[in-house]
Regions:
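Second-shell loop/turn segments in exported
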Residues: 28-29, 47-51, 97
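Bacterial signal peptide processing site
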Residues: 16-19
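Post-signal peptide N-terminal segment of mature Sec-exported envelope proteins
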Residues: 23-45, 69-70
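Exposed beta-sheet edge and beta->alpha loop/turn motif
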Residues: 80-131
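Short solvent-exposed beta->alpha transition segments
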Residues: 40-92
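C-terminal motif of bacterial Sec signal peptides marking the signal peptidase cleavage site
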Residues: 11-14
Length: 131
């Protein structure tokens, strides 16, 4: 009987859909806010996991420094890869990898979103130069 309950729980965990489209919309929002310098709004809309890992002022400074020294202005982006990660324990995640063109360079951007109460929240972000 225990195995039946375990199987039932695993099946229920697998039924919860992860909305990749919502995560992609959040990437568009990220780029719009980046372009407008709305770094505090980005931070406030991020997951508690991200907010607990970096202060608001450090987050803002990282993005300002990225714009000034590495990236410049955002121009366009293309989705290269997407992955849904369903956890038995913890929040489900969507990982999106983009090739993005900025005025100073082309980068690979990796966005990690976690599903919190039905909404996709930014959990992690990084970029690496590809030119």
């Amino acid at each position: 009987m225990r195995y039946f309950y375990l199987l039932f729980i695993l099946v229920l965990c697998g039924c919860s859909p992860l909305d990749v489209n919502s995560a992609q919309e959040e990437v568009s929002r990220f780029h719009d806010f980046y372009q407008s310098g709305k770094y505090i709004e980005l931070y406030n809309g991020a997951s508690k996991t991200l907010q607990e890992s970096i202060s608001e002022s450090d987050f803002v400074n990282v993005l300002k420094r990225a714009e000034v020294t590495d990236l410049g202005k955002f121009q366009k982006t293309t989705l290269k890869s997407q992955k849904k990660v369903k956890h038995l324990i913890g929040s489900d995640e969507v990982v999106l990898i983009y090739a993005s063109v900025y005025s100073k360079r082309i980068v690979q951007e990796i966005f990690v979103f976690e599903k919190i109460k039905g909404n996709m929240k930014l959990k992690g972000y990084k970029y690496d130069s590809i030119n």
